[in-house]
């Protein structure tokens, strides 16, 4: 049976932030945990499915691989023989179950960890030549960076955060609701277990400041529209010393005046005059490496495709290079002189009769078909 989409399993959008994913998983864990669900026979499977989706979508590297390759990224042999282990162990679910079941039954006495910085996205436009050959570009992005005065602590230099007097450093407080004692994040320190009594004058206790930074981004040869390049740790700074998020550079290749790209192949149209189409000859055609000669055989028709091997795009993942496919278009002459028109009339007259049928077999076949069509109508 085919696996369901991980975003569909958790009921979140594909651009959902980590906190939305965590919230959705907590809801499903509450609903389908085997210790709490006895009526639904499929509860255990649904629980495992949600757990697997959570593990993948809260790991930035695994999520990026899933967004690009789907479930194939975690199948045996996927992602070039390595990939990422899918649905197995390795994830720390203590933060989830401490929240879900600790809130209900009174467990999970621990501080809320400082939030990791948000991931950022930058849309980069490339010419076809840049995408095919690779390029290094400098980009400037607005972001939240670690405060250079307090170094991310949020406290004024010479001071430090102090233990929260409300929760005494636990990050959580207990509230009584009927027969139950429920734990929730401390409203004073917001679950951190510490407060800043003397905040930094520059960041006002946040540990982060708004700024722009310039980065040098190396674009590998062979990228195409839709490819993403991940720059680890170049997203927004985390709260109070937590890890920074990542920066994702989204590639968009601009339209080219001559070539169209499909995968690793390039396509172009090559106009030729009807004399060359009939008699044959040699023309120069453009490639990304310069001009090359293309031999046109006699009696070439519009739409004829000529393949030039190895003149396309080299795969971004290595391996063979694509081809250039040139589609011939026979051009009808315009702005003819009287002499040229007279020569064409003489040529046209030579096509009359049996000789003409031999010169234009497709036209004869078409006319025979039209004649048969009308004959059938009159019967």
Curated annotation (Swiss-Prot):
CXXCXGXG motif repeats lie at residues 147-154, 164-171, 186-193, 200-207. Disulfide bonds: none annotated. Zn(2+) 1 binds at residues 147, 150, 200, 203. It is found in: Cytoplasm. GO terms for cellular component: cytoplasm. InterPro entries: DnaJ, DnaJ_C, DnaJ_domain, DnaJ_domain_CS, HSP40/DnaJ_pept-bd, HSP_DnaJ_Cys-rich_dom, HSP_DnaJ_Cys-rich_dom_sf, J_dom_sf. Residues 5-70 form the J domain. Binds 2 Zn(2+) ions per monomer. A zinc finger (CR-type) spans 134-212. SMART domains: DnaJ. GO terms for molecular function: ATP binding; heat shock protein binding; unfolded protein binding; zinc ion binding. Zn(2+) 2 binds at residues 164, 167, 186, 189. GO terms for biological process: chaperone cofactor-dependent protein refolding; DNA replication; protein refolding; response to heat. Its cofactor is Zn(2+). Keywords: Chaperone, Cytoplasm, DNA replication, Metal-binding, Repeat, Stress response, Zinc, Zinc-finger. Its main location: cytoplasm. It comes from the Bacteria. PROSITE patterns: DNAJ_1, DNAJ_2, ZF_CR. HAMAP family: DnaJ (MF_01152). Belongs to the DnaJ family. Homodimer. The J domain is necessary and sufficient to stimulate DnaK ATPase activity. Zinc center 1 plays an important role in the autonomous, DnaK-independent chaperone activity of DnaJ. Zinc center 2 is essential for interaction with DnaK and for DnaJ activity. Participates actively in the response to hyperosmotic and heat shock by preventing the aggregation of stress-denatured proteins and by disaggregating proteins, also in an autonomous, DnaK-independent fashion. Unfolded proteins bind initially to DnaJ; upon interaction with the DnaJ-bound protein, DnaK hydrolyzes its bound ATP, resulting in the formation of a stable complex. GrpE releases ADP from DnaK; ATP binding to DnaK triggers the release of the substrate protein, thus completing the reaction cycle. NCBIfam families: DnaJ_bact, PRK10767.1. This is Chaperone protein DnaJ. It comes from Yersinia pestis. The gene is dnaJ.
